[in-house]
Amino acid sequence: MLNAASWSHWRDRANECRDAQRLVPAQSPPLIGRWRISCWARRRLLNEVTELNACELEIDLFCRGLRIPGDVPLDGVRGISRTRAGLGSGLEVILPTGSRIKKEIWTNVPVVESFATESPYRLQGAGDEGFSIVDDRVNHTYPVRLPEEPDWYTRQTSGGTQMNRIGVLQGTCLGIYINPVCTFWNYQPPLNCRFCTTGQNVGASEALEKSVADVVETCRAAKAESGITFVHLNGGFQGSRGIAFALPYVRAIKEHVGLLVGLQLAPERDFSRYDALMSTGVDHVSFCLEFLDPAWFERICPGKARIHGQGLFLEALAYCAARMPSGSVSGEIIAGVEPIERTHEAIDLIAKLGAFPTVCIFRPTLGSDMEDWPSPAYAAMREVMVHVYEACRRHWIPVGLAPRIEVSLVVTPDETALLAPRTAGFYVYEAYLRLAALAARPLFARRLRTVSAHLG
């Protein structure tokens, strides 16, 4: 029951809900003017405040993290993997949605960062009885699943490297850092992006060098045993040799495994190299713009600001988006650092260029230069993700078409449908996405065969 002592708590929680503000003015305790909150309004407020849908819960978990008590057994579940930039350093969790739009959401929940120790969310349960996440503020429970660690993780390649040091699953996708450490880490003083820990992870928790053969064997095992359809390759800044270095990996995976292949590298000034990349059959290209505000871009990404500049990221993105199938290119940005208005502008700009916005909620990763920065607020991040959906809808960006791709590191555009207002435009866009997915099935089936198979 609401009382004056608990009012501040409920008011703050209500401010994070879409509709609660119209029910309970922020300036008033339980007496509003001369009348009390009705039982109906009180129940509505409690429901709005305590029950989040799966996408809202995903956002709040990204912002607040999760506590794992010592008596909760995690035997057999995927371990915490500090690979690549360090963003996947959390616990892999599957959230059922109860929605026909999307059945489940895969998310990588922060658990080791300092802010997670203060999280109101707590994991409970065990493998045999099932797991759930409890919100200790209101004792609300969300049933979840924890994916098992695949057997191939501990298998060795023919080159003698354990496969989980070549690549790891992030959601249902395989992530592999193919290049040596991003060159920005080699400058004195270092010019690395301040949120990144690639320089600490590559060569420590994952292999420093990954041969084409080792990558192919790992991809083949992940496809055969984990059912993956997509592998994401990235490698940071490697001077002018980034795409040239990546081409043999892309070709080998397409020829010998048959997967959808995505590539994320620093932009290059010779755009003909992107034509060479497209000729290999690469399925997805992404560009990490990170921030739209020039001052924040220079402050947080000194190497990118000095060597590339923001303009090159956008020019390369536009070039690829104009030449690849719609929905094949993405622009990646970080929300929760620069002013939210600039994040909205970045989302609109990326969608206007024909790409889909991939928005990462800022995570102050352990070991990074920003590990002591605060995690962003839920309400602002929810607003950002609603904006993602609306931008994709306005520009008819086809999202979520590829089969069996669930990315756990970010809130994906197709997941944001669970946040969107149910307008006529919403239903038209969702119908468009379903028809597009149906039409794209033969294309994806062909791209998931080896090159030799569909040439024959």
Language-model segments: residues:
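Conserved alpha-helical substructure of the radical SAM core
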Residues: 200-232, 444, 456
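Extreme N-terminal basic, low-complexity initiation segments
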Residues: 2-6
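Auxiliary Fe-S-binding modules of radical SAM enzymes
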Residues: 7-136, 140, 344-456
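Short N-terminal secondary-structure initiator segments
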Residues: 126-138, 164-181, 229-242, 296-316, ...
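"Short basic amphipathic alpha-helical interaction patches in structured regions
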Residues: 190-196, 209-211, 246-248
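N-terminal [4Fe-4S]-dependent radical SAM core
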Residues: 102-192, 199-205
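Conserved AdoMet/S-adenosylmethionine-binding subsite of the radical SAM
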Residues: 216, 220-223, 230, 234-376, ...
